[in-house]
């Protein structure tokens, strides 16, 4: 039997990741009418645009679900988000502005926790709203089978019968109204939004055009910092880490990481911090474009990176950054719990994050405009007296530097000889306009 089912398995339990929106509501009721036994599973990911989670399972029962559960995923989501922060698992940047992989982190948590809940209920068929062109279909496929090797996957949006009957939002709305649910289709936006406590993703529709900019987006986690009528006062904020864990904001300690991140979101959101516009490569190697929000993670990341650069040596930082980019790509591909990802992640958490203790004061202004005002840590290896231009007791003398220059640069002769070889074989063209005019025609 194939893992992916192309038609509805009638008479069997089918779990659906149920958001309460039009698509999953119509799909659930349609499956019920067609003879399946639908079960609804809703992930509480702290979505900033959802204000009544408890009502969602009730609606699922109303639409025909044989069972409905609300799974609180917030603690696990924040734990994985902080792990990504500690390991720098972010590979998508544009001109130094970072996408914090908030959707891939959310999928790792949702895909494992919902399927685990389904397994408890004896539900071994899973459906969700991901389409065949996106990343999520592969992420959910991997995470679902990782948790339940007996899992079968049924997606209404891959079932031609469902598509023929309910292929669009207008058809779904009419279907629900005819069923007596008086479902009012929400106003169509110029883009689609997916969010969790870590961040929000805006993409598709009008945002598919690169002629449409960030200004068409209405932020849900912060302010539209580009608007002249939005008043934003500069604000100083302190962030404290202990052994790699964020523990305090503005001197207020948080025992619950979820509450700390919510407060970080509020602080960063007041300034529009952490918004970015990215062109990225999807898993299938086609490019897509997204506009992202992550005010809290952006705030924590500024402080964390500052401490990393002040505490660790150059080679450690280089490994942290290189491994972080590799890990970010694995996370994006739905491989956050694969052995190669665990190896990279735990290396960073053990050897980089554990030394990160200290406090950073930051002045936030508009958008991603900020300044670091102070950096304190008992673990700093930054010691200005080593390089002071003033007359102070030095850790090394001019004679020491002469010896270092001599020993460190013995290869200059070798380099000069190699450049001559390259010139002789035509790889370099010496001359007045050359980057290396000084080697032209020189003989040994």
Swiss-Prot record:
Record's keyword terms, sorted: Amino-acid biosynthesis, Arginine biosynthesis, ATP-binding, Cytoplasm, Ligase, Nucleotide-binding
GO terms of molecular function: argininosuccinate synthase activity; ATP binding; protein homodimerization activity
Database matches in Pfam families: Arginosuc_syn_C, Arginosuc_synth
Binding-site positions, L-citrulline: 99, 135, 139, 192, 201, 203, 280
Catalysed reactions, semicolon-separated: L-citrulline + L-aspartate + ATP = 2-(N(omega)-L-arginino)succinate + AMP + diphosphate + H(+)
Keyword Nucleotide-binding among record annotations: yes
Binding residue positions for L-aspartate: 131, 135-136
Binding locations of ATP: 17-25, 43, 129, 131, 136, 194
GO biological process: argininosuccinate metabolic process; L-arginine biosynthetic process; urea cycle
Gene Ontology cellular-component annotations: cytoplasm
EC number: 6.3.4.5
First-tier enzyme category under EC: ligase
Classification via SUPFAM superfamilies: Adenine nucleotide alpha hydrolases-like, Argininosuccinate synthetase, C-terminal domain
Annotated pathway: Amino-acid biosynthesis; L-arginine biosynthesis; L-arginine from L-ornithine and carbamoyl phosphate: step 2/3
Cross-referenced InterPro entries: Arg_succ_synth_type2_subfam (IPR023437), Arginosuc_syn_C (IPR048268), Arginosuc_syn_N (IPR048267), Arginosuc_synth (IPR001518), Arginosuc_synth_CS (IPR018223), Arginosuc_synth_type_1_subfam (IPR023434), AS_cat/multimer_dom_body (IPR024074), AS_multimer_C_tail (IPR024073)
Subunit comment: Homotetramer.
Family: Belongs to the argininosuccinate synthase family. Type 2 subfamily.
Name recorded for this polypeptide: Argininosuccinate synthase
Organism: Burkholderia lata (strain ATCC 17760 / DSM 23089 / LMG 22485 / NCIMB 9086 / R18194 / 383)
């Amino acid at each position: 039997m194939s893992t992916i089912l192309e038609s509805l398995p009638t008479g069997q339990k089918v779990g659906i990741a149920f958001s309460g929106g039009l698509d999953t509501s119509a799909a659930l009721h349609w499956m019920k009418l067609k003879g399946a036994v639908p079960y609804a599973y809703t992930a509480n990911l702290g979505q900033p645009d959802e204000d009544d989670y408890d009502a969602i399972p009730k609606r699922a029962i109303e639409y025909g679900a044989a069972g409905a559960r609300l799974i609180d995923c917030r603690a696990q989501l924040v734990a994985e988000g902080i792990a990504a922060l500690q390991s720098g698992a972010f590979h998508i940047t544009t001109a130094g502005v970072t996408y914090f992989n908030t959707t891939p982190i959310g999928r790792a948590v949702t895909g494992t926790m919902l399927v685990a809940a389904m397994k408890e209920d004896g539900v071994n068929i899973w459906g969700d709203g991901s389409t065949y062109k996106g990343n999520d279909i592969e992420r959910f496929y991997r995470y679902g089978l990782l948790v339940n090797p007996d899992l079968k996957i049924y997606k209404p949006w891959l079932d031609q019968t469902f598509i023929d009957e309910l292929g669009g939002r207008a058809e779904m709305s009419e279907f629900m109204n005819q069923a007596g649910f008086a479902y009012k289709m929400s106003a169509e936006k110029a883009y689609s939004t997916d969010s969790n406590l870590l961040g929000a993703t805006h993409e598709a529709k009008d945002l598919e055009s690169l002629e449409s900019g960030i200004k068409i987006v209405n932020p849900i986690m912060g302010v539209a910092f580009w608007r002249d009528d939005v008043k934003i006062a500069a604000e100083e904020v302190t962030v404290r880490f202990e052994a790699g864990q964020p523990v305090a904001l503005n001197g207020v300690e948080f025992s619950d990481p979820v509450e700390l991140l919510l407060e970080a979101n509020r602080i960063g959101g007041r300034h529009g911090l952490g918004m970015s516009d990215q062109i990225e490569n999807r898993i299938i190697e086609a490019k897509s474009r997204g506009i992202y929000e992550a005010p809290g993670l952006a705030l924590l990341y500024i402080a964390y990176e500052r401490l990393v650069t002040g505490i660790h040596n150059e080679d450690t930082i280089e490994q942290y950054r290189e491994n972080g980019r590799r890990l970010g790509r694995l996370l994006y591909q739905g491989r956050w719990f694969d052995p190669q990802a665990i190896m990279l992640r735990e290396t960073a958490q053990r050897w980089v994050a554990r030394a990160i203790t200290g406090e950073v004061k930051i002045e936030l202004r508009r958008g991603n405009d900020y300044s670091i005002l102070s950096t304190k840590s008992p673990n700093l290896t930054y010691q200005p007296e080593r390089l002071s231009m003033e007359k102070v007791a030095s850790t090394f003398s001019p004679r020491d530097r002469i010896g270092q220059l001599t020993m460190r640069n013995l290869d200059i002769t070798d380099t000069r000889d190699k450049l001559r070889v390259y010139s002789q074989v035509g790889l370099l063209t010496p001359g007045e306009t050359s980057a290396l005019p000084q080697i032209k025609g020189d003989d040994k």
